[in-house]
Amino acid sequence: MECDLSIDVPSLTSADRPPTICIVNADSGRLAGRVALVTGASRGIGLAVARRLVAEGARVGLTARHPEALAEAVAALGGPAHAVAVAGRADDAGHRRAAVDAVTEAFGPVDVLVNNVGINPAYGPLVELDLAAARKILDVNLVGTLGWVQQVAAGMDERGGCVVNVSSIAGRTPSPGIAFYGVSKAAVDHLTACLAVELAPKVRVNAVAPAVVKTRFAAALHEGREEEVTRAYPLGRLGLPRDVAGAVAFLASDDAAWITGQTLVLDGGVSLAGRPAG
């Protein structure tokens, strides 16, 4: 069985489309004056992260595959004074260069990179996994993550900056059906630690590892099973994109100035219950 679980989808539905954000901290928020770049930001976790960073005072560049969805996201974030978007594929080095150049031209050098984009185009046992799909997963989730860091690292090393990678609890707990996705995210956790050592002291690098968050990415895995899956969570609910966004904003801010190389698990307590997250 094969399914496309890419974070990015062609467009926002009316139910998913957020209201235009109320920017209350543009001059005094924790990220006032900073420039952020968020990948996979047309919807779901990526859009929630972008929305939170703008609310904290940052100006934000968005990347994803679909121009129409990105245009809607920019409008929801308050328009071009607060956000710009560049459409393209995360595994395309040319797109990564173009996105960083566009954000730099619009707002200035990137201070905060959020590597959110991730895919899982195949579902099923590892022994049946198509190796072309495995390579694609690694190209986007791992190699692409490193590629984005390479695009901004030199500038950050001069000025300071931070990177937040969006990993997954699947990288810590074997998850049947999406095991290779989990392998890619375990590698992202280790990449995070390695980059933190190499890029210190000017650049902090951390990750967040959510369990099941209510997005289309997760819905494709748990269709018809949400109530069953939710029962495993001591906090009594699945995660929401804003839960991840709050953690990312914290790690991107000076409140986390002495934190680097860490992966912050966001799982509603499910790992304490000793059961699979999904």
What are these regions (language model features)?
Residues 168:
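Residue(s) in the substrate-gating loop at a strand-loop-helix junction
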Residues 149, 184, 192:
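Active-site helix of classical SDR
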Residues 96, 146, 237-266, 271:
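C-terminal substrate-recognition "lid" of short-chain dehydrogenase/reductases
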Residues 124-126, 133-138, 218, 229:
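Substrate-binding pocket helix/loop in short-chain dehydrogenase/reductase
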Residues 154, 196-201, 257:
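Alpha-helical segment proximal to the catalytic Tyr-Lys
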Residues 42-43:
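Conserved glycine-rich cofactor-binding loop
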Residues 22-27, 120-123, 173, 249, ...:
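Short C-terminal tail/terminal secondary-structure segment
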